């Protein structure tokens, strides 16, 4: 319950009046990457390698060995900016018991996001349209069969179109295929009691064996 209340509070969902003002970055989140790359290139002391997947890693006395498709290279330290289960796979047999305990405690669930223009998923009354629209499905017996969030992007982004553009997370009813522009599969952490306890232990891992962790799963 505390996790849900914290999430709602952080997103301004616990207040009726004085709603938060949404802001967006012009050009989208890719601007973060462009600014970081520009800073690294301007610095002259760092090198950014794109499209270079890391297959595994191993900590040694004076650094960290990263295994890539073209071979293995040694670095001073490593920051694992990924899901905890992905970090655990990269560490492999090199993971410590504490890392296995903390990283392995967090479960993930698959989620599908659908980008579309099928406005039938929104409330019948246009006056009720919001940035976030909640929909609950029930089975024949009236029991809850699924929950979906429809994000109305026109309320969140300065889109140049009048037509409603939505992102539906885990749709509970069919969306008109002719109005679907993209389907994206995600994996999100499940913040249950085990995950919350693991989050409190992440700090004990940071910097150990020249390894750092970050990501939404850290809390």
Where are these regions (language model features)?
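Active-site/ligand-binding neighborhood in enzyme catalytic cores
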Residues: 1-58
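Short, loop-centered acidic/histidine patches that primarily coordinate divalent metals
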Residues: 12, 27, 170-172, 214-218
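A structural signal for the hydrophobic beta-strands that form the central parallel beta-sheet
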Residues: 48-50, 80, 213
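Mid-domain catalytic core of redox enzymes
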Residues: 52-189
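C-terminal catalytic lobe of FAD-dependent flavoproteins
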Residues: 174-219
């Amino acid at each position: 319950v505390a996790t849900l209340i914290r999430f709602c509070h952080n997103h301004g969902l616990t207040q009726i009046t004085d709603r938060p003002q949404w802001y967006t970055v012009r050009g989208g989140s890719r601007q973060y990457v462009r600014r970081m790359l520009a800073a690294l290139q301007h610095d002259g002391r760092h090198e950014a390698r794109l499209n270079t997947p890391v297959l595994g890693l191993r900590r040694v006395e004076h650094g960290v060995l990263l295994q890539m498709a073209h071979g293995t290279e040694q670095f001073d330290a490593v920051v694992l900016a990924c899901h905890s289960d992905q970090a655990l796979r990269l560490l492999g047999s090199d993971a410590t018991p504490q890392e296995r305990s903390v990283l392995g405690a967090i479960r993930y669930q698959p989620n599908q996001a659908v980008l579309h223009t099928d406005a039938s998923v929104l409330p019948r009354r246009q006056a009720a349209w919001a940035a976030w629209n909640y929909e609950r499905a029930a089975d024949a017996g009236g029991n809850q069969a699924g929950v979906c969030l429809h994000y109305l992007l026109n309320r969140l982004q300065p889109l140049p179109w009048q037509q409603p553009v939505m992102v539906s997370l885990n749709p509970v009813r069919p969306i008109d295929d002719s109005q679907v522009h993209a389907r994206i599969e995600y994996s999100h952490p499940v913040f249950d009691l085990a995950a919350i306890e693991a989050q409190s232990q992440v700090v004990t891992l940071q910097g150990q064996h020249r390894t750092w962790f970050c990501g939404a799963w850290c809390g």
